[in-house]
């Protein structure tokens, strides 16, 4: 019989989907297991027969399914306002590019967000965060990018820090100052990139407000040369990088981000084989964002088969934002990734666990149920992981465990 230490907590009689690629079974499934949690981490995984049937801090899950906590590795959670009117315009035939050129798009949200009080932004973002937590999310990336000036970018990152301080969910904050050219720099995008590189990145990094730098390399964002200036600045300071690339056209953004060993290349609908090979060589994760593909009614799908062939890890995220993916649901994103992009349900699960952890640089501590990893996991009223992907309108979450505590 396995001896437990004072303070240990046990979840026994579980069906465990470890998402450990070293396990032979689909989803890393093993039955009749028990998790021993100690000081917020998984201490051990043992057959339940090795543990007492009952006792203090022993939770009998009656055969329920347990998976790693979900990870949403790409969100724009902190913003004010909405862009419902733009959606109507698109339904009537206007393109995303046309709306952006008319001062809509990202800059419309920038105006609303700049005018919004920090406390109001916090309350809006907190409600969104808790919606994701209710689906079993335990690690969440939050980008800035709706300030496009030093003061408001800092305000957004302070909101992310305040959310993290609640200890309800892990937050990975990302500086996305290179999201769009603000109205005041409309005729001088290079001048805005200078502001990003010489002021925003170094000052906000010095304050410890973000973990990585992101950018939007696209015809409605920044060109390759401008994007490279951002990457060079970040890497010179030792900051991890990532990028929104190849969403609406093929500019070579994935190759660029991969050349700087980017954590991830996101969207990638127009990615070509050269870009896929570069991602493999750079150790860059491909992040699929099916919500934006759906909402923009795009037709160019990411090259999933090429990503498989080159063994590029593929993550899936909600891309929750007011303009192109107003879906605050990672379950829905998983379903869309399967239906629209052809992922298998197991690939979708890998995309919101171990591959999503890699996209945030957290692969050594998050995204799998393994000894030594963080005790972030979810107990489901389900028999198979596929059920969560199959029926996104139903949430079978039974229990969410964060840092070893039921939350």
UniProtKB/Swiss-Prot annotation:
Binding residues annotated for N-formimidoyl-L-glutamate, in chain numbering: 146, 321, 323
Binding site for Fe(3+): 74, 76, 244, 319
One Gene Ontology term of the molecular function aspect: zinc ion binding
Database matches in InterPro entries: Amidohydro-rel, HutI, Metal-dep_hydrolase_composite, Metal_Hydrolase
Top-rank taxon, per record: Bacteria
Keyword vocabulary terms for this entry: Cytoplasm, Histidine metabolism, Hydrolase, Iron, Metal-binding, Zinc
Binding of 4-imidazolone-5-propanoate, residues: 83, 146, 179, 247, 324
Protein name, UniProt field: Imidazolonepropionase
Annotated organism of origin: Salmonella typhimurium (strain LT2 / SGSC1412 / ATCC 700720)
